[in-house]
A protein has these predicted regions:
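Protein-protein interaction/assembly regions in multi-subunit complexes
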Residues: 1-189, 194-235, 242, 247-276, ...
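Extended C-terminal regions of large enzymes
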Residues: 149, 156-160, 164-186, 192-615
Length: 615
């Protein structure tokens, strides 16, 4: 079987680290990573727990394909109850850390309790121990990794850590590995910081040699890689341009949220697009884009490595930012750019580097800045209050806010609370573009009806990665649906949500789903695990996971009222583009979505659904 078969349990209050067998019944029912980690959380954590208390737990979980030769098989998920939303938080990351944990012989690490002082966990194959991290507290993500590799004399060490944002309680702090790969959303890094846990450093030399049927697995993996290579998105578009290629595409569709969703098209989209990363700068004659980059086992290589203009105001006297770094990608470029009306590409790169360096989510950060800039233009916030002039389009304000938030100083402390809490404090809660407290990603939910429904019903708050209907509504994958049409979208959203839960739990990247279906994943999982995992079986597992997450949220106090969208999307029509005049049809779609899910009229799984899914 491709599961390692054991987990680490770390009690931070007691300072103990113990090994225990993986619950194989749960593994077969929930697969791994997001699904299996969530099952452990649901069984062990009170849904009403304070996310930042010692009673909450935080889990790092790999999938059965993590660490194998399956393409993109380097993924892992961090699972906890999130502080930004109060809902279940499952945040996925790539890079090499997940594969390294699996190669050390572990499927999962569960942290419980709260340390009295900063600590980190060191794993070297079968040996795992908590160590003092006083020398790491206050360091950046980048510096923490550098210190650990040097002090442990192991340049191949893989580190998953927080920066100052996680230590300072930014509610959307991230867990970062390999310098610029992150479990970025929902504040998982905030929970890590609340437990005085700074990092997990892992070295694995055992490999993943327990694939059940190696010959069948290699054949299935090879066939699946060919599917990726032959696909226009995974074989051409993403390797050449990365996700940022979507900037002009979504802008032309008229669904690029601009200036806190007041507009749906950005006049500066071309200035912050993937195409803008390639030509030489006029100032220095050097390109923004240095190269692309792949995570462990990935044959897509969508990652970007770029370099800033050393003369830009944001880094002019900061040589530590002159080297190559990760980014930009579409979501960050949108959140730091169009969402705030900023078209200075260098400023976007700087703010993105700060997010990576100090460990916080650029989506929630950028979307919160959009609300701040709108409040500033309304006169609700003043320069004296926030420390800088902040009209829409101000690159200087964006960079200042990034520094403030990272360091937890000045108005940065309020930005770190997220848009829901900030706008409520200043009397304008309708200006928070969020669901369940988590900020919107880079697609307008009016013009693209399905993604609006996906935001409203996402178990972790507004999220494109929980049901990426953009594939169908914009890109025509697997079939083209009309973005402005709301009929049929409840069934489409459910299908994407269930399949995505299965992809996540297998341990592969969701970007493979541009080319793969679960029919491509199933033979790989089946050969690796030695159990019967058909496409239908995996889809059933995905549906089970979705409903389990939903029931956790219901028990935490979430209701039908939380499956909503901001007033702006429901009452203010799109002003331009193909969707001009359209608002979200969420009220019409939500009851049909509940029916498709087998839930009652209040959004609770019925007894028939629970029995069918084995909940």
């Amino acid at each position: 079987m491709s599961w390692a078969g054991k987990i680490l349990r770390v009690n931070l209050s007691a300072g103990t680290v113990t090994s225990e067998p993986l619950n194989m019944e749960w593994a077969k029912a929930y697969l791994g990573s997001r699904g299996l980690g969530s099952k452990y959380l649901v069984e062990e954590v009170d849904p009403k727990v304070d996310p930042l208390s010692a009673d909450n737990k935080i889990i790092w979980a790999t999938g059965p394909l993590t660490g194998t030769m399956a393409s993109t098989g380097g993924r892992y998920t961090v699972i906890t109850k999130g502080p930004l939303t109060g809902a279940i938080a499952c945040s996925n990351s790539g890079g090499y850390w997940g594969a390294e944990l699996k190669m050390a012989g572990w499927d999962m690490v569960i942290f419980e309790g709260q340390s009295a002082k900063p600590v980190y966990l060191y794993i070297n194959d079968d040996v795992a121990e908590l160590r003092d991290a006083g020398h790491l507290w206050g360091q950046s993500v980048w510096r923490t990794e550098e210190i650990l590799k040097s002090s442990l004399q192991d340049p191949l060490l893989r580190v998953s850590s927080i920066g100052k944002a996680g230590e300072n309680g930014v509610l959307y702090a991230a867990v970062v590995n390999d310098l610029h790969r992150a479990a970025g959303r929902s504040g998982v890094g905030t929970v890590m910081g609340s437990k005085n846990l700074t990092a997990i450093a892992v070295r694995g030399t055992q490999g993943v040699g327990n694939v059940q049927n190696p010959k069948a697995f290699m054949a299935a993996a090879k066939a699946a890689k060919k599917v990726l290579a032959d696909n226009a998105v995974t074989g051409q578009g993403l390797p050449a341009y990365g996700t940022q290629v979507l900037m002009n595409v979504i802008n032309e569709v008229g669904a690029l949220p601009t200036r806190n969703h007041r507009d749906v098209q950005f006049e500066g989209a071309k200035d912050i697009s993937a195409e803008a990363m390639v030509p030489p700068r006029a100032t220095a004659g050097k390109k923004h884009l240095v190269t692309n980059q792949a995570c462990f086992g990935c044959t897509i290589a969508c990652g970007r490595i770029s370099k800033m203009d050393e003369g830009h105001f944001s880094v002019k006297n900061k040589p530590e930012y002159w080297g190559a770094s990760g980014g930009l990608e579409y979501e960050a470029a949108w959140a730091l750019g169009a969402a705030n009306g900023v078209k200075d590409l260098e400023a976007l790169q700087y703010a993105n580097m700060v997010c990576n360096e100090e460990g916080f989510d650029p989506i929630s950060f950028g979307a919160t800045i959009g609300a701040v800039m709108e409040l500033y233009e309304m006169g609700v916030l003043t320069k004296e209050q926030i420390g800088v002039e902040a009209p829409f389009g101000s690159a200087e304000a964006l960079c200042e806010f990034a520094d403030m938030t990272a360091k937890g100083i000045g108005f940065g402390k309020e930005i770190g609370l997220g848009s829901k809490r900030l706008t409520a404090k200043y009397g304008h809660p309708d200006l928070s573009m969020s669901v369940k407290g988590q900020e919107f990603p880079a697609y307008d939910g009016r013009v693209i009806q399905g993604i609006g429904l996906a935001y409203a019903t996402s178990n972790r708050g507004a999220c494109h990665l929980r049901g990426y209907t953009i594939a169908s509504e914009v890109l025509g994958i697997p079939v083209k649906t009309e973005p402005t049409e709301h009929e049929g979208k409840p069934e489409l959203v459910k299908a994407f949500q269930d399949a995505t839960a299965a992809f996540d739990s297998a341990g592969v990247c969701i970007f493979t789903s541009f080319a793969w279906t679960l029919a491509d994943v199933a033979p790989q999982v089946q050969a690796a695990c030695g159990e019967e995992f058909t496409m239908e079986h995996l889809n059933h597992i995905g549906e089970r996971i979705w409903n389990m997450e939903r029931e956790f949220n219901n028990a935490a106090g979430f209701t039908k009222a939380d499956d909503s969208l901001p007033k702006r999307l429901l009452t203010e029509a799109a002003k331009t583009g193909p969707g001009k005049g359209i608002v979200s049809k969420l009220p019409e779609m939500l009851p049909k979505y509940y029916d498709a899910r087998g839930w009652d009229s209040e959004g609770r799984p019925t007894s028939v659904t629970r029995e069918r899914l084995g909940l």
